[in-house]
């Protein structure tokens, strides 16, 4: 937890308007997570923009006012406010996966026709 807090502090040294946080709470205890969440909220209150990358659904649901859902490295949806639910995120991923699988199957059958 201390290493993440030091990295956050170092990132703020140049007073950026935008801060990218990639999995800032991965592998740390609950107390340290709470401290980092509090710190992130303070930054937002100061007008900073945080790009928060996380694979932990509860973090996204609890911390974000906008979520970009990615699947296989591509943005597949943008959710705001009350749209940000676990069900919606999972539905968007499943819908995209099915669509891509169907398109892949269609292109393979077209190749077989030739």
Name what the model sees in each region.
Residues 1-114:
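Glycine-rich phosphate-binding loops of nucleotide-dependent enzymes
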């Amino acid at each position: 937890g201390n290493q993440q807090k030091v990295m956050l502090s170092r990132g703020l040294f140049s007073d950026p308007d935008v801060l990218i946080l990639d999995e800032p709470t991965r592998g740390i205890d609950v107390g340290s997570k709470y401290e980092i969440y509090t710190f992130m909220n303070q930054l937002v209150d100061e007008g900073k923009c945080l790009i928060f990358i996380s694979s932990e659904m509860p973090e996204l649901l609890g911390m974000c006012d906008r979520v970009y859902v990615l699947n296989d490295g591509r943005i597949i949806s943008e959710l705001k406010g009350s749209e940000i639910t676990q069900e919606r995120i999972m539905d968007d991923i499943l819908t995209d996966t099915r669509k891509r699988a169907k398109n892949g199957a269609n292109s393979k059958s077209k190749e077989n026709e030739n």
